[in-house]
Swiss-Prot record:
Domain HAMP: 224-276
Protein name as catalogued: Methyl-accepting chemotaxis protein III
Species per Swiss-Prot/TrEMBL record: Escherichia coli (strain K12)
Any one GO CC term of the record: methyl accepting chemotaxis protein complex
CDD domains: HAMP, MCP_signal, Tar_Tsr_sensor
Subcellular localization, as worded in the UniProt entry: Cell inner membrane
Keywords: Cell inner membrane, Cell membrane, Chemotaxis, Membrane, Methylation, Transducer, Transmembrane, Transmembrane helix
Membrane topology, Periplasmic segments: 45-201
Gene coding for it: trg
Keyword Membrane: yes
GO function term, MF aspect, one: protein homodimerization activity
Length: 546
C-alpha cells in the first residue's frame, strides 16, 4: 500500500503502545512517589513542629506554674502555722505535706525549663539571673517550712512578709520576661508550622493539578492514538460485516493500532476482489445455466412430438397389417405370386420393425438426455443458490471465513457433477447419431424391399382386381409411415442441434466453475474446515498488499 497516508500522521501515531503505556504508567508512579514523599515530608515536618510547639507550651506552663506552686506552698505553710495554734495537728501535717509537694512541683517545672532542647544566647543570659532568683526563692522558703513544721505561726508570718515577698517579686519580674520569650517562641513555632502546613497544602494542590493535567494529556493522547483509531477500526469491521466494501483507505501509523488498521484495509481489498470474482463467476454461471434450461425445455418438447409421431407410425402400421391380411384373403388364386409378395412384404415388415426398434432406441436415448438435462438444470439451480450463499458468507467471514470454505467446497462438487453430466450428454448424443445413421440405412433397405414388393404386386395387378381398393389403402398407410419417419428425422436433427448447444453451455459452465474454484482457493483454512485439505491448510490467513 501507499505509505504516504502514514507519513502525514503525527509522531505519536508511530510510537509503539508498549513503550507509550510504560512511560505513562512510569510517569504516574513517579508522580505518585513524589506526591507520597512530599506528603510524608510535610506530615513529618508538621508533627515535628507540633511537638516543638507543644514542648514550648509545656516549658512555658511549667515555668509559669513554678511561681504559682511556690505561692500555693506559702499559703499552705501559713495555714499549717494557723492549724498548729489551734492544735489541729492533722491539718498542719496535711498543709505541710502539700507545701512540700508544691515546692517539688515548682522545682520540676523549673528543671523542665532548664532542660529545654533549644536555647538562644538571650535565653542563656536570662537563665543565669532567673536561676539565681529561683534558687534564692527556694532557699528563702526553707526557714518558712521549718517554722511551719515547728508550729511557729508568728515566725512564718514575719518571714513571709519580710523575706519571701521580696524574693517572690524579684523572681516574678524575671519570670515574666522568660515566659514572654517562651510565648514568643511558641507563637513563632506555631506560625512556622502553619506556614509549612500551608506550603504542604500548596504542594499537594500543585501535585493534584499536575496529576490532573497529566491525566488530561494522557486521555487526549490515548484518545487520539488508541481510542479513535480503534473506533474507526470497529466501524470498518461493522461495515465489512454488513457487506459494505466501499470504504476508502485511512492513514495508519506504525504502531500496533496502525498495523491493525492496515491489515483491516488489506483484508477489505482482498475480500472485495474475491467477492467481485465470485459474483462475476456466479452471474456467468447463472446465464449459462439459464441457456441450458431453455434449450433443455425445447428439447423436451420436441422429444414429446417425436414420441407422438412414433405412436402415429405404430397405428398406421397396424392398419396396414389389417389391409394386407384382407388382400391376402382375396388373392388365393394368385398364391404363388402372392406368396412371393408375402415374402417380400415380410422382409419389408422386418425392416420396418428394425426401423421401429431403432427409433425406440432413439426415444430411449432422448429420454435419458431429458433426465440428464434435468439433473444439469437442478445442479445449475443449486449452483446459483450456493454462489449467492458464498457471497453472503464472504461478507460475514471476517478473518476466519469458515462457512465460506464450505460453500466453496459445495460449488466445486456441483461443478464436477455438471462436468460429468455434460460428458454423459456427449456420449448419448454420439449414440443418438449412430442410431440415426443405422435407422437411415434400414429405411433405405426398407425402401428397396418395398420397391420389390411394388414390382411384384404390379405383375399380378390383373389378378388382384378385387384388392385394388385394399392396395390403395395400403399405399396411403405406407405414405403416412414415410411422412412420420421423415418428421422424426427432422425432429431428431433439431434435437442434435439443441444437444450441441447444451454441450457448449456445459463447457462454459465448467470454465466458470473452474474460475470460481480458483477464486475460492485464495482462502487457506484449517484442516477441519473443509472435507478436502486445500493448499496451505493450517497456515494463518495472509493478506495481499493492495
Amino acid at each position: 500500500m501507499n505509505t504516504t497516508p502514514s507519513q502525514r500522521l503525527g509522531f505519536l501515531h508511530h510510537i509503539r503502545l508498549v513503550p507509550l503505556f510504560a512511560c505513562i504508567l512510569g510517569g504516574i508512579l513517579v508522580l505518585f512517589a513524589l506526591s507520597s514523599a512530599l506528603a510524608g515530608y510535610f506530615l513529618w515536618q508538621a508533627d515535628r513542629d507540633q511537638r516543638d510547639v507543644t514542648a514550648e507550651i509545656e516549658i512555658r506552663t511549667g515555668l509559669a506554674n513554678s511561681s504559682d506552686f511556690l505561692r500555693s506552698a506559702r499559703i499552705n505553710m501559713i495555714q499549717a502555722g494557723a492549724a498548729s495554734r489551734i492544735a489541729e495537728m492533722e491539718a498542719m501535717k496535711r498543709n505541710i505535706a502539700q507545701a512540700e509537694s508544691e515546692i517539688k512541683q515548682s522545682q520540676q517545672g523549673y528543671r523542665a525549663y532548664q532542660n529545654r532542647p533549644v536555647k538562644t544566647p538571650a535565653d542563656e543570659a536570662l537563665d543565669t539571673e532567673l536561676n539565681q532568683r529561683f534558687q534564692a526563692y527556694i532557699t528563702g522558703m526553707q526557714p518558712m517550712l521549718k517554722y511551719a513544721k515547728n508550729g511557729m505561726f508568728e515566725a512564718i508570718i514575719n518571714h513571709e512578709s519580710e523575706q519571701i515577698r521580696p524574693l517572690d517579686n524579684a523572681y516574678t519580674d524575671i519570670l515574666n520576661k522568660a515566659v514572654k520569650i517562651r510565648s514568643t517562641r511558641a507563637n513563632q513555632l506555631a506560625e512556622l508550622a502553619h506556614q509549612r502546613t500551608r506550603l504542604g497544602g500548596m504542594f499537594m494542590i500543585g501535585a493534584f493539578v499536575l496529576a490532573l493535567v497529566m491525566t488530561l494529556i494522557t486521555f487526549m493522547v490515548l484518545r487520539r492514538i488508541v481510542i479513535r483509531p480503534l473506533q474507526h477500526a470497529a466501524q470498518r469491521i461493522e461495515k465489512i460485516a454488513s457487506g459494505d466494501l466501499t470504504m476508502n483507505d485511512e492513514p495508519a501509523g506504525r504502531n500496533e493500532i496502525g498495523r491493525l488498521s492496515r491489515h483491516l484495509q488489506q483484508m477489505q481489498h482482498s475480500l472485495g476482489m474475491t467477492v467481485g470474482t465470485v459474483r462475476q463467476g456466479a452471474e456467468e454461471i447463472y446465464r449459462g445455466t439459464s441457456e441450458i434450461s431453455a434449450g433443455n425445455a425445447d428439447l423436451s418438447s420436441r422429444t414429446e412430438e417425436q414420441a407422438a409421431a412414433i405412436e402415429q407410425t405404430a397405428a398406421s402400421m397396424e392398419q396396414l397389417t389389417a389391409t394386407v391380411k384382407q388382400n391376402a384373403d382375396n388373392a388365393h388364386h394368385a398364391s404363388k405370386l402372392a406368396q412371393e409378395a408375402s415374402i417380400k412384404a415380410s422382409d419389408g415388415g422386418q425392416t420396418v420393425s428394425g426401423v421401429v426398434k431403432t427409433m425406440g432406441a432413439i426415444s430411449t436415448s432422448s429420454k435419458k438426455i431429458s433426465e440428464i438435462t434435468a439433473v444439469i438444470n437442478s445442479i445449475a439451480f443449486q449452483t446459483n443458490i450456493l454462489a449467492l450463499n458464498a457471497a453472503v458468507e464472504a461478507a460475514r467471514a471476517g478473518e476466519q471465513g469458515r462457512g465460506f470454505a464450505v460453500v466453496a467446497s459445495e460449488v466445486r462438487t456441483l461443478a464436477s457433477r455438471s462436468a460429468q453430466a455434460a460428458k454423459e450428454i456427449e456420449g448419448l448424443i454420439s449414440e443418438s447419431v449412430r442410431l440415426i445413421d443405422l435407422g437411415s440405412d434400414e429405411v433405405a433397405t426398407a425402401g428397396k424391399t418395398m420397391s420389390t414388393i411394388v414390382d411384384a404386386v404390379a405383375s399380378v395387378t390383373h389378378i388382384m382386381q378385387e384388392i385394388a381398393a385394399a392396395s390403395d389403402e395400403q399405399s396411403r398407410g405406407i405414405t403416412q409411415v414415410s411422412q412420420a419417419i421423415s418428421e422424426m428425422d427432422k425432429v431428431t436433427q433439431q434435437n442434435a442441434s439443441l444437444v450441441e448447444e447444451a454441450s457448449a453451455a456445459a463447457v462454459s459452465l465448467e470454465e466458470q466453475a473452474a474460475r470460481l474454484t480458483e477464486a475460492v482457493d485464495v482462502f487457506r483454512l484449517h484442516k477441519h474446515s473443509v472435507s478436502a485439505e486445500p493448499r496451505g491448510a493450517g497456515e494463518p490467513v495472509s493478506f495481499a498488499t493492495v
